[in-house]
Amino acid sequence: LNGSLNLWGSGRPIREFLWGEDMADASVYVMEHIDFDQLKGDNPEVRNCHINIGSGREATIAQVAEMVKNAVGFKGEIHWDSSKPDGTMRKLTDVSKLHALGWRHRVELEDGIPALYKWYLEH
C-alpha cells in the first residue's frame, strides 16, 4: 500500500464521530430511561426537549485520515487539495444533556477505525 492519496480540502475541519452501535445504544437508552415530560417540566411553552446524541469528542479530518492510514497500513503520502472546499470548519454536538441523563459513548474513534477495518477484512 504505497503511492499517494489526494483528499479534498485542508484537513483542518473538525468533526465529531460516533460508533454506530453507540448510536443504537444511546437511542435505546433514551427510549427506555427518559420521560420527555420531565425534560420540559411544568412549563408547556418549553420546546427544548431534544437530546443530541454524539461522542462530544472532536477530531480534524487530517487526524482521521492518519488514523485510517495507520489502520490499513498505507505507507504512501496524503496530499491535501486546498482547491477543493473544506465545508463547515467545525461540527460538534452539545451532548451535555445526554451526559447529565446518564449515557456516554463507549467506543473511541481511535479504537473504532481499526475495529471497522478488521470487520471489513473478515466480511
Question: Residue spans of the language-model regions?
Answer:
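C-terminal substrate-binding subdomain of Rossmann-fold SDR/epimerase-dehydratase oxidoreductases
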Residues: 1-123
